[in-house]
Amino acid sequence: MDELTLSIGGSPGKLAGTQLLYKQKIDKEIRLSPTDLLFSSNTVDHKLRNKRTTIALLSREVQARLGKWMISFADQKGTAADFGLQLAKWVQASTQLHYYVHPADMSALRAADQSLIRQLPRVTVEVCKTKKVSQTDPIEHKYQSRPGMIEGGVTITPRQAVTLEEIYPLASRPEKGVIMFMLSQAHLEHLIHPVIKQVSNYFTCVKVGTSGFSLNYNHPYIRAMFLEPITACDVVELPLQALHARFSAGKGHLYLCGDGHAPRTLTCAQMFDIPHVHDFTMPSVTVVSFYAPEQHIAIARYASWYEKDTICRLLQSTLPDVEKLVWLCAMSYPIFPSLRPTLTGSIFSRCKVVVSVSAERSRLLSDGLPKWAEWVDNVLSDRIAKPACLILIGPKASSKSFVTRQLVAKLNASSLSVEGDNFGRVDSDAFGKWVTMMVSNSTLPTSWAQFDLMQNDKEIASYVDIRFNDICVKHGFCELDDLRTKNAGVLQGEFARSFIEIIKDPSCGLRAFFSWLFSLYGLPRGLMLESHTNVEIAEYPPTTCILQLLPNYDVMSVLLERDARKGISKLAEMQMEEYYNGLRIGTYRSVLACELLRVAEVGPPVEG
């Protein structure tokens, strides 16, 4: 059983606000290997360690009734601090228990229930008015018998004992103890009932997830109880053969979550009877459609949670077209023709733009927003050591810097502190610029304010960019046309060697950079650390708050259109992103820019 199902019951259907979907019919038993038994530190039963074991599963209905029984029992006991251990003993009954019943309570039961009470396995029943105890007994053992008592001092009525037996017969309970599977997800904590949390501390607890990361859908218990969600983002880049293999292997264990799935994905899902659960998360959204003016053919369509008036003011403002497009993409998500449309700054001049309000289904789902909100709350409440770090992974040209700048400015403006800024950001290119200054013996910043100026200085080239550009030149890749006439694969091996050499350098690597950074005067309490890849974060400061930013447009087209950066050509930058893309794995929780900006109440710089 698990904490969540005990707390909320297991009604079939998607749990609101999450991607959790119970199976209609769960497996009757699961087989656990030693690697599946990641025990919590509060585990009291060690008999299962290093052993392969088969356990029976409780259905959703049984877990719901059992959880309700625990909660009602605790409600009758008030705020007693000691009922958790004794209640867990009674529910598990993995060792011999002594149960003392008052004669009047026993006689009030039906004959069948009296017989049931007396025949409970692993329970010794004694009918008596009082329980004599010696002075050496612990204080909890001196609790009087009426309305009934089990060893350890917690009272339970015969009717409660009968009800529990009807829900979960003692004969069916494992002699080695009941396992409590811990989902350990921060965004689910508010759903776990306090009584279940207290009682679960005294069960054999096995973790099936880690806060800051997703559930382990390969774990036998999760695989038996829940369907694994497949969002449009998860399969958008899979070739058809790989998609077919994924659905074939996961038949009976997967479901399509939300909308925005490509027709081939829907067709493939139907072939393997994989259910599709729509997600109506917003009653209405503002839809921005781009049409070719002559044919009136839709080129792209985005939906935004911002009000129509806000979007119209943005589009009618005097901001440059490129800046308008950046804001629009950061405030919305794509709904046509794909999850990553190809957009350029000229789209406003060559297309007709139509803004409307529509009842629209959410096209993209992310599970990282609660983790970001939790991190912000921790920084403001000073519950974690300074600096509290959040890592944001995303491709080049995915608006990481734009989003973090807006968030930091808004958060600092709304949480003034006499000690300085509460929040700060470290650009994904800041490390490369620092290395450039190190190798050129330039004067390094001595305060956070000076560092912030340095990382935003476009005249300082990143050492990583310079090295990658030199590799391209060395192999004769100087013009974009060279990508059609030469084999770009020769660049990847040298990219890899240089990249690892740079980030792991003992004196100028990432660890040395962060050691220097954390010594600066005026360091904010919370830092958003940007990263291009999963590989880099192994050298970052430790944190459990790691998110992946989902780009909602084709980043390659943006790299091709935007101005070349100092120290690197467009060709080299595009090849660098090709290399980085292979080092990003969808391990961590994802988040959309529009979700972050909306929650932080960030709006475009236009007059209302």
From Swiss-Prot:
Keyword Hydrolase: no
GO CC annotation, single: viral outer capsid
Subcellular location: Virion; Host cytoplasm, Host cytoskeleton
Protein name as annotated: Microtubule-associated protein VP7
Presence of the UniProt keyword DNA damage in the record: no
Residues passing through the membrane, by range: none
Main location: virion
Alphabetical UniProt keywords: Capsid protein, Host cytoplasm, Host cytoskeleton, Outer capsid protein, Virion
